[in-house]
Swiss-Prot record:
Transmembrane stretches, start-end: 5-25, 32-52
Species for this entry: Tupaia virus (isolate Tupaia/Thailand/-/1986) (TUPV)
Keywords for this protein: Membrane, Transmembrane, Transmembrane helix
Record-given protein name: Small hydrophobic protein
Cellular component aspect of the GO annotation: membrane
Length: 93
């Protein structure tokens, strides 16, 4: 356990990317599964830790039609953009 904490501390000092990689490795290493599933869990942790925006935007991309048909999406997935004010001076007037 002390060795693990030393490795985590050293990875934190090296940089954020190394820290995330070591964290994903340790989360995949300490689990209840055997070695084949440890590799799968490690890859899943890498995806979740390194690519959260891409991971969730991919889910939104594939499920957007289901979300929009269920919740009713008047903008077709686009953010509402106000065209009332074109600059800060228009907003003040």
């Amino acid at each position: 356990m002390i060795t693990t904490l030393i490795i985590i501390g050293a990875a934190f000092l090296v940089g954020p990317r190394t820290f995330k990689f070591v964290l994903a490795y340790l989360l995949g290493y300490y689990n209840a599964f055997g070695p084949p599933l440890q590799i799968v869990q490690f890859m899943v942790w890498l995806i979740i830790i390194y690519f959260p925006k891409k991971f969730f935007s991919l889910g939104w991309y594939f499920c957007h039609d289901a979300f929009s048909s269920y919740f009713g999406d008047p903008n077709g997935g686009q953010l509402p953009v106000s065209t009332k004010f074109h600059s800060l001076t228009d907003m003040i007037d």
